[in-house]
Every structure is written in structure tokens, then in C-alpha cells.
Amino acid sequence: GVKQLSSIEDEYKGVRQGTGVADNRYSTHSQTTITPSSKIIVMSAAEVWFLRAEAALRYNTGDDVENCYKQGVTVSFAQWDANGVSDYLESDDRPAAYVDVFDAKFNADAPSTITPKWDNTADKEEKLERIITQKWLALYPEGCEAWAEQRRTGYPRLIKVAVKDRKS
């Protein structure tokens, strides 16, 4: 069963890396079980669309960058049976600051102001950030692939680790 370690019931809050979770107020991750018969995603349709968007942006391949970007988001939503893709693609919402529910010393400003809504007037770097940020989200649950994208491009911009002590 799920062990409730905090006073916040029926709600999950993310924990910033490096905050140290030794004090029972935070739940820890669960163990992953992968077997030879586990189904894994080698490359999703969303990843292909985002690769095409990036290639069109960088190398003028003839694909429409905005269309490829929107298709990537759309098929990612479809992959997970998520609703609201049209509203999401029109959203000007920016990433929120991280607010630790127990200790304000771990609070952090949002590292980016990128929105889901495509902006044709943006410069090439902002367009790349938008593409890769959505690609990173779409790569779930393939953490290694998402990590490689972040290392390759620097996107998405992530909140820095609070304490570098190998415990979190």
C-alpha cells in the first residue's frame, strides 16, 4: 500500500531534487519492475513529429515547423488518452515557481517562461526551446531518452538541484 508520510492527504506534490528526503515528511519513489515481456516504447509517434519540427527549424527540410510541433503535442495527448489538447496548444501559461510544502529554503523560481502556444514571431532559439520542452514531456516514461535530449540541447530548462549530496 501507499504510505502517507506527510500531513497533506489526497494530494501529490513534486519534490525538488537535492532537498534531502531523509525526514519522513516526503514519500520516496516506488520500485520499477521490468521483465523480458514488458512492453516498452522504442520511439513514439510524438517523438518523430518533434524530430521533424527540430529538423525543419534547423535545416529547412520543407516541413512546416509549427505543424510538426502541433502534431507532436496532439499525438502525445492521444497516446495517453488525454483531453484538452486544443486548449493546451493555445495556452499562454508559463511554468510556475516551485514551492516546497514544508521548507521555504527549497523554493525556486521557474527556470523558463516558455508557453505551449506556438509563436511564429519568436526567434529560432525560443522555438527550439518550445519544441524540445514539449518533446521532453512527450518522452515520458522514457527517462533516459528525455535526459539525453536535455543534455543535448539544454532544454527544458530545469530547476537546479538544491543540495548536491547524492542522497536525492
Model-based region annotation:
Residues 3-167:
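Acidic/polar-rich alpha-helix caps and helix-coil junctions
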